[in-house]
Structures are given as C-alpha cells and as structure tokens.
Amino acid sequence: MEFLRGGAALLQLLLVLSISRCCSTDPDRKVCQGTSNQMTMLDNHYLKMKKMYSGCNVVLENLEITYTQENQDLSFLQSIQEVGGYVLIAMNEVSTIPLVNLRLIRGQNLYEGNFTLLVMSNYQKNPSSPDVYQVGLKQLQLSNLTEILSGGVKVSHNPLLCNVETINWWDIVDKTSNPTMNLIPHAFERQCQKCDHGCVNGSCWAPGPGHCQKFTKLLCAEQCNRRCRGPKPIDCCNEHCAGGCTGPRATDCLACRDFNDDGTCKDTCPPPKIYDIVSHQVVDNPNIKYTFGAACVKECPSNYVVTEGACVRSCSAGMLEVDENGKRSCKPCDGVCPKVCDGIGIGSLSNTIAVNSTNIRSFSNCTKINGDIILNRNSFEGDPHYKIGTMDPEHLWNLTTVKEITGYLVIMWWPENMTSLSVFQNLEIIRGRTTFSRGFSFVVVQVRHLQWLGLRSLKEVSAGNVILKNTLQLRYANTINWRRLFRSEDQSIEYDARTENQTCNNECSEDGCWGPGPTMCVSCLHVDRGGRCVASCNLLQGEPREAQVDGRCVQCHQECLVQTDSLTCYGPGPANCSKSAHFQDGPQCIPRCPHGILGDGDTLIWKYADKMGQCQPCHQNCTQGCSGPGLSGCRGDIVSHSSLAVGLVSGLLITVIVALLIVVLLRRRRIKRKRTIRCLLQEKELVEPLTPSGQAPNQAFLRILKETEFKKDRVLGSGAFGTVYKGLWNPDGENIRIPVAIKVLREATSPKVNQEVLDEAYVMASVDHPHVCRLLGICLTSAVQLVTQLMPYGCLLDYVRQHQERICGQWLLNWCVQIAKGMNYLEERHLVHRDLAARNVLLKNPNHVKITDFGLSKLLTADEKEYQADGGKVPIKWMALESILQWTYTHQSDVWSYGVTVWELMTFGSKPYDGIPAKEIASVLENGERLPQPPICTIEVYMIILKCWMIDPSSRPRFRELVGEFSQMARDPSRYLVIQGNLPSLSDRRLFSRLLSSDDDVVDADEYLLPYKRINRQGSEPCIPPTGHPVRENSITLRNISDPTQNALEKDLDGHEYVNQPGSETSSRLSDIYNPNYEDLTDGWGPVSLSSQEAETNFSRPEYLNTNQNSLPLVSSGSMDDPDYQAGYQAAFLPQTGALTGNGMFLPAAENLEYLGQGGALYTPVR
C-alpha cells in the first residue's frame, strides 16, 4: 500500500506587492495571480500563459490551461503546487498536462458555480474522417493531487484521455460540500497502458509507479478526522492540514486548510488585539499578522490597505483610506466621505466588461474608483446584442473628478476628436491591486491619433506595469521619468511612441512632461503655482503676495499686511503673516478684536486693541466690553461684586414672594369654586349652566300615539325582536287616513332591546330629508310600537331581484344618487348609519328611495370623528376593514358599505362574497381581493366602486363627491351602464287596477306632516327605448337637464320634443311593477274583470265630480316627490281640490295613489 512519503513542506505564503505575474519573497515560493478568462482566447495566448505561470508555486485565483497546440511545451506548469480558484483544462491539443506537483485546489471560485476541476473537449478531429481523432489530451498528470476543498469535478469529451476513469474521486473531493460530479466516459476505442501493479485499487493518473493515486482519506483509521499518511491512528494529520501530511503536528502539513503562519497551519491569523490577563485590559498584539489570501503576513503589500487585521483592496462604506506611519489603513470618515464608486467588475458593475453609455453617468462626481476602468470600441459604438447604444464622447467628462483607481486603467479606443486623455487630468494614483492581462495597470493600445497623455496630476502607479502600444502619434511619453511614479523595482514601461518634437516647456524639470505647456510638467523646475510651473513666486512684488512652501506658491491670507521690502507671509493662513493688516490676537491676524465671543466654560471673551494693534483682555468685571485696561475702560455701568450680590438676592426674594402669592390665590379660587358647586348641587334646580357646551339644541318633534289611533292590516315581515305590519293611522280629531308601517316589539324582549328601539326612534325622529325614512310617532304600550312611513314597493334588494329584466340604467344611477344624498345628509348631521345595505333602502316609488333601519346608527357629537363599538351582531360583508378588525365606525366606513350597496344594485341583488365565511372576510380584504366588476358596469362606474373599498379611509371619496359623480353619470346612463331591454310603460289595465283599489281618504304622510310644502308626488317614469318617445335615452335634453335624478323634463325640455305626441305616452308614467308584500292586486274587481265601458262608468260617477271647476293649466308631475327638486315650480298652479281629467272631470285631491302602489300622481285622463 502506497501512501504519501517525504519530508514536510513548510508552506510560507509571504505574499507581496505584485498580483500580476509571478513574484516572490522567498527563492522557493512564488505566487502568481491567475486568470478569469474562462474559454476566451487572447492574443499570444501561449506566451502570456507561459510568462504568467513560469516558476509559479501558488496561483491565487484560477489556473486556466486552454488552446494549447500539440507541439507546445507545458513543462512550466510543473512548479504549481496550489490553486486558490478552479482549474480549467479545455480545448487543448497537447498530449500531456504535467501538473505533477499540484497538491491542493481550494475552489474559492467555481466554474459555472459548480466545478473546481474541469477537463473537457481536449481533442482535434481528422477533417477527412469525422470519427477519427488525430491529436488530443492523453495523459492528465495530476500525480500529487490529494484534495479539493470545495466544488465538484467535470470530465467530458476527451476521447484520447487514459487512466482517469480509474481515479477514486471521493478520496479527493469533500463530501460535506455536496460536490457535483459529472464524469462522462467516451466510447472511442483508445489504446491505453494500464496502471502500475503497485497502485492501490488500480488507480493512477498515468502509467508508471510515479503516477499512482495518493490516498489520504479513504484508507485512514477511524480515529482520523480528515487526512492521514498511513492506516494507523498515529498516522492521522492535524485538523488544519490539507492535502496530507508528514507527521501529526500542524507544522507537518503539506498544505494548510485555512492559513499558513510561518509554516504552522492555523484557522486564524494572530489578531490585532489580545486580552492581557495581568492588566485585565485589551491591548495591542505585538505579534500581529495580517490575513492575505491563505497566508498570515507581517505587512500587507504596499498597494493594499489594512482593515480589521486583513489586507484588502478597498475600504468598506463609510471608511476612508489614509496613510499612517507608512501603512495604508481604513479609518472612519470625519464628516462626509469622498464619493467612492464601483469600477468595472465590482459591485453594481460586476457583470460589465467596459464603460459604456449605460453606466458612464454612474462615475459622475466620483473621487475614487474601486475596481477598474476599461474603454474599448464597444464603449463608444455600443453593443446591439445587449441593447447598448452609442456613447457621446462628451460624457467622458464624468470621469474628470476621479483621483484614484484601485485597479487598472485600460484604453483601447478613444474618440477621434480628442487628442489627449485630459478627462483624467485629476487622476493622481493608479493602485494596480488588480492588473490586466500580463500584469499591466496602465494600458493605452491601438489609439493611433493620440498626441499626448495629459495626465498632469498622476503621481503614482503603485503596482503593475505600463504599456503604450500602437500609439504612433503619441509624443512626450519617452520624456517621462516613469521610475518617479513606480513603487517597485519590478515595474516596467513598454511603449513605441514617437521620439521627435518632444521638447517639454522650459519650466518642466528633467522628469519630463505629459504634454505641451507649463501645466503638463511631471514636476516643476522651479516652483508650482496652482498646477502651473513658474520661475518664481510673488514674494516681494506682484499680486497677490505669496509664500514659497515645498516648491509651491501659496497665497498669503487677506489679513496679512502687504510688504514691499520683505516677505508678506511665510505660509498659508492668518497665523503666518509678517504683519497684520488690522489687529493681531496672539499669532492670528484678525479684522477686529474678540467682542462677546463665547469661550471655554461658556464665558464671554471681551478684548480691546492696544496702541500696537495687539488684542488685550478686558477687566474681569467688564460685562459690556471695554476700550482700555482696568475698570475705567469698561463700557456701561460698573457694578461691584457687593451690589451685584444684593441685586441677585433681592430679585430672588421678590420672585419667591410673588410665587407664594400666586399659589395662595389659586388655592383660594379652587376652594371657592368647590364650595359653589357643592351649594349648587344641593339646590333643587340649577339656576345657570355650569359647563355650557355651545351646541345647538335638537328640536326634533316626537309624537306619542295612542293605540286606538292606528289599526294593523297585515304582516309585512317579522324578525328576532318583533313584527312589522302594514296599517293605517287616523290622527285624533282629523278625518284622514295615512298608510303607515308599524313595528311592534315582542313583549318578552329584554330591557336592552327596548333601549335599542328607543335609540332608533331618537335617530329617526331627528332626521328630515327626502331620502331618509322618518318616524311618525311611537306608542309606549307594553310592547313598544314604532310608526313610520309606509314604502309601498318594499326594500330595494327584493325589488331589483324580482324585476331585473324591467329595470333600466337611469333608475339604477338615480338610486345611487339618492342613496348618496341621503347618506350625505346623515354625515352632515354627524350620524353614522353602520348598516347601509340594499335591504335597508326602501322604495316609495321606483323613482324615489329612502334609507331606513337605524337600529345600528350612532349620533356623533361635533368633536367626535369615529364611534367605537363593543360587539354584537353586525353585517360583516358590508363593513369596512377597520370596522371588522377594530370595531371602529366613521362616515368613511359608511362609504365602504355604500360601495357594496351599489354593487348589489348593479348585480341585481347578488350576495356579496357569496360562498366565503364571514370569519374569513377580513383576511380576504387584507390580501387585496374585492368584489368583481358587475357585467352591466363600465370601467368608470367600477372605478368609483373600487375607490369606496380603499384600505385607507381617507383615500375613499366623501358622499358629496359620490353625489356629483353619479349625478354626472345619470345624465348619460347608456354611456356608463350596458343593459339589454327596457322597462315598459304601465298599461291602462294596471292603471285601472290601481285607481279602483285606492281609498278616497288616504293621505301621504309627507303631505300630512308638511302640508305647506305642497309635495307633488313623483311618478315612476318608465325606461323608453333609445328610439322611442317621449324622450330619447341619450338625447341632448337628458344630458343637459339641471338634475338627472329628478323628472324635470317638463321644466327643462323644449316643447319641440312633445309636438304631435299622443297623450297616453305622456300620461303613462305609472309603473306596472308591484310588490306583492305591499299590494294585493288579485281582487276580483280589478281591470281584468272590468270592461272599458264599466271603467268609464266608474269614472263618471257623481262622487268624482267637483263643482269648483278649475280652468288653470295642468302641470306635469315630473319628479316632484322631493320638495328639494321643485325648482321653478309654482304651487299656486296646482288644483287645490282635485285633478282635472281629460273628459273634464276631477279626481279628489286627498286621493294618494302612491301609497297604493301607484308610481306617480295622475294629471291626465285615462283613455
């Protein structure tokens, strides 16, 4: 059995400055950067690869061996022992890859995110025979490879490769990292030599005893945690070892798993701070070492910075790179940090290959670039494949503020109209922490029209080489002393620039220049004045006066007095003046002496100027300044210490006395008030209000009715708390009857229910609006009874369900307007309804709805904005989200319920959220789900409904806004609602039925309560087809009437639409839709059983005649049910005693057809 043998290899990664090509600090250990080109083929590919890896032992990044030819020598790869990233062997024709000393692949970078070792497509086919392979990889000599720390292996499309299928990869890879293994054998028959008979398990990389696979894990004893050098427990390697070992100690490792500290493998490097057990303090570690790659080093490379014990390429956000004792480190910024931007390949530009039109603006106002700057042909011409447009050369000036580049600067293309790199005129340092190709940090190639560089501020190229190639017109490059810019002896310059006509300005030193003129000098022969080399500074003459400091001309401060025969100043600032122009306070020249300036200890500083112009301090007792020394020079009153003390004591005493007096007076006032309140409470009556609120009194009138005043007819409905009857109310002392609805409470109801009914009565008695149901009176019997107006057509929900095919868009929009008007009235009265739904809206007639059911309503005071409920049964699916979750009710939560009510109307009585349990409604609303768009609604109507369902109550519309929105839509209903079919006119037969079933002495409740308003009842105006009469649905008249919700056609219409129109069309405004719960039209003497002659006889009976014949003109009823709609209506024109028919007869004025199911008042004859 063969195991690893030999002495321990003490791996010392003393990594230094260059990260480009191979460099070394120890003759036996060399480190090189590696590449990340993947499958890209570069110019001079083999030569660049040979120069990169010759003599290299450790590759920091990736080892990429690609595109080698059959006869090329790869023996320079034999020195490589460790790779930090991945190993790529692809597209090669060479027969052998001699990586015989490679022990460890760390896998810090993975190819395609999965693979650490890739061997693929290493062959070339015979052009004449596609199935015959001429050349290709035959031997992969990884003879000492024993460990891959992370990632998997891929071997595919290598038809000539031998022996690799014998390798046991599970001894090499780490199973804990879940490696991806993609091993695809090739079916091509090849002639391979077998492994040496001494190889364990017949595993080898190539024939011969020196190429057997080295096992360091699978054949170890059970006591070994990781690797071993033999089968015994004593042969286990240290836990910090990687790739095997020669002994059990951490110094016997062939490679280190984490960090190498002078030949000892550790998991961390010595930290900057340690705990001192003697002083019990955290002190600096005298043996500190910095983490650099996989090594612990005493000093970071000069072009790297130190932060938290590590060598990094750039500081993190909020940190500034500074130079301390010759070491560059990261410190927190003092104030605002200079703007640091990502370069190509870093951060936001990690997937970008060059500066282009999409990212050039990201470099605006940047001081430092973390990364690289690359400008190539695609930067300016764009890339159609990636949809990158061309870049305007003027945008390059976004780079003019850049002072430092941590990586490299590569220019492979430049605009023809720019002859220099003057956009980088402020660039001071190129760090070269990453390098281009063969280790270059500054590259200018293929820019043939470039005449000079123009990098006048460049002072340092920290690492990497410089190359200026194919720049035939470039001048002045050979005049530059590049050694002045370099920081290492290994750095070099390559250029093929012109050598003629390269005379620098006379003021430039022998270090050369970046271009013509005194502003392009690398260094000045004499002095530098603001970036311009001059012969001398303005020391004794000239303006402004200057001082010479470190070869620079520095302008004197404005407080320095200009001298003629001597220097005006010795440096910048007011402290370096030879003589002050005004006054001098110590070394500082100032325009005036300190006057009341706040100093240390929050004391004011006062000074005066003596005869020499020197500022001297005033006397300590001078509080207003002084003009000279001593107390005599003080300004203002001079107060001695004793008088000052007396004044202070007197002031304090007076303050205490005043405070005591105020406390006594307040206490006496409080005691007096308590006594007054106590006396008032003991009186039987209070003679004056103690805390007047200022609110107006509620002067609503509540009638107390006797049970004998009304009689019940039939049951309209019943519920948990009582029964509702249809009945007639006959007020005492009056010979009239009023149709009413009587709500009778059950006698067994609880006191709480009685209180809730009284609360409802209070609310209903307090409202007075055409679209809000009023309370007529209350009867306080054993079972409380509420008497309200009777709505003949029942609730709106049942109406739209039963008569879906007969309802038109104008009715729907009118109902929306009227409900919004009623709710707007309640909002103005500070009343929150809390139970608005289609079931709680009643129809007086199809053109007039009223809001009812105030069982849950709450009246808010003037300063209340919301009502907090305490539970109970509530209509969850009509409630706003905040009402469901927090039991909070506002006018805006009523807006939500209004939206659900409108949805019910537009869907003709569909159930909201049907099929969803009530307990899930809150989560459904929070997830953004809402009721769907009704089929008849256009998007305009649905958007208004959706606004009512916004989560934020303040985002929902107010009711007054909803009135305006739906009023506008009601003027043009066919534009906003799409409904098939129309509501037909009332037939004469149904009209006869309504007339014959009416009572002669029935009076409308509104007329009885408000007789002075002369309420003219609204008819139920039918929906007429768009081409029918009397009014076209989409006519200009309908769109321009004053209020589309009112039947104001008689007021607003021109007479031309009524020319030659039959009287039956204008008179048949009574709906033939009825509610069987309110009207029973099945009597045997209805219009079905009457002939036309009998009907006419009925109308000719003498009791229908009126001797007081009124000849005044008739007025169309229109929409006169609502007194607010009677704009322009003159009550005097109405008949006071009856209505004239077409045959000269009158109908009694007391006959109210509306409450017997009639849709409107009758003013024209029935033919």
From Swiss-Prot:
Keywords: ATP-binding, Disulfide bond, Glycoprotein, Kinase, Membrane, Nucleotide-binding, Phosphoprotein, Proto-oncogene, Receptor, Signal, Transferase, Transmembrane, Transmembrane helix, Tyrosine-protein kinase. It catalyses: L-tyrosyl-[protein] + ATP = O-phospho-L-tyrosyl-[protein] + ADP + H(+). Its main location: membrane. The active site is at D835 (proton acceptor). Disulfide bonds join C195-C204, C199-C212, C220-C228, C224-C236, C237-C245, C241-C253, C256-C265, C269-C296, C300-C311, C315-C330, C333-C337, C504-C513, C508-C521, C524-C533, C537-C553, C556-C569, C560-C577, C593-C615, C618-C626, C622-C634. GO terms for biological process: negative regulation of apoptotic process; neurogenesis; positive regulation of epithelial cell proliferation; regulation of signal transduction. CDD domains: FU, PTKc_EGFR. It is found in: Membrane. The chain crosses the membrane at residues 643-665. Residues 1-25 form the signal peptide. Residues 710-977 form the Protein kinase domain. Its EC number is 2.7.10.1. Probable receptor with tyrosine-protein kinase activity. This is Melanoma receptor tyrosine-protein kinase. The gene is xmrk.
